[in-house]
């Protein structure tokens, strides 16, 4: 495969080269306060009854800690904890869905944590819960973040079967020294196999997540990753 030269827009870089909040949630944690009660939520939910919905489901569990991560997470290999989490999530879905019962879901995203921490049965259970309580658009975007270190290739078949049409592979960097430094070693050949499998299964969109600013990265190494 021939590498293409990357042209950087320096004006665009300078325009956005400043610090800002890290949106691990929206609104950010600082915006939450006790003055906003359930009646306020009900009023807010009813303000735009004709608008479509975007749903985000947070799966906080990870098998291993990535040293750069600032997301809300639980590091554990006790799979039963995910079952307990889904029990509580089901209560939340049942409580909130009636507020949006006439609105169409055009986007659904599972993030984390590691959404593919869930096994096949747990994945099917969660998707069934969502489809039972929300109305989904036929051509809506249904996406999930995938950790290529902690998934069987056949799990992509399950994800496609339950309705996912977009996957995002958390690669971050292909350089082994960088991977070791952030505790995220992975198999490049397996990532290639995942991309080929996703293409064969008909996923509408497949992307790779990359991070710049990790230990041992430089222009040359990141150019290799790109």
Identify what each model region corresponds to.
Residues 1-53:
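Flexible, acidic/Gly-rich N-terminal and inter-domain linker regions that tether
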Residues 28-31, 65, 74-75:
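A short secondary-structure junction motif
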Residues 48-49, 58-60, 101, 200:
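Short glycine/proline-enriched loop/turn "hinge" motifs that connect secondary-structure elements
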Residues 54, 67, 142:
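Divalent metal-dependent hydrolysis catalytic cores, especially in the metallo-beta-lactamase
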Residues 55-57, 169:
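Short beta-strand motif preference
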Residues 57-73:
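Local cysteine-cluster metal-coordination motifs and their immediate loop/turn environment
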Residues 73-100, 105-226:
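Conserved non-cysteine loop/helix-boundary elements of the Radical SAM core domain that shape
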């Amino acid at each position: 495969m021939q590498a293409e030269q990357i042209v950087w827009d320096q004006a665009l870089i300078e325009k956005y080269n400043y610090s800002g909040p890290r949106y691990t949630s929206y609104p950010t944690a600082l915006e939450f306060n006790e003055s906003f009660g359930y009646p306020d939520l009900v009023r807010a939910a009813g303000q735009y009854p004709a608008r479509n919905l975007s749903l985000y489901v947070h799966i906080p569990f990870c098998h291993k800690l990535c040293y750069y991560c600032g997301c809300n997470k639980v590091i554990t290999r006790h799979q039963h904890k995910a079952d307990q989490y889904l029990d509580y999530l089901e209560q939340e879905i049942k409580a909130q869905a009636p507020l949006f019962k006439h609105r169409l879901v055009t986007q659904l995203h599972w993030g984390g944590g590691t959404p593919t921490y869930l096994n096949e049965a747990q994945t099917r259970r969660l998707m069934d819960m969502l489809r039972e309580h929300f109305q989904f658009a036929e051509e809506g975007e249904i996406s999930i973040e995938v950790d290529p270190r902690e998934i069987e290739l056949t799990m992509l078949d399950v994800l496609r079967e339950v309705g996912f049409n977009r996957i995002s592979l958390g690669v971050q960097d292909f350089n082994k020294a960088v991977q070791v430094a952030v505790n995220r070693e992975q198999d490049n050949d397996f990532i290639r196999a995942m991309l080929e499998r996703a293409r064969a299964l008909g996923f509408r969109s497949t992307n790779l997540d990359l991070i710049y600013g990790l230990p041992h990265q430089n222009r040359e190494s990141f150019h290799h990753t790109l």
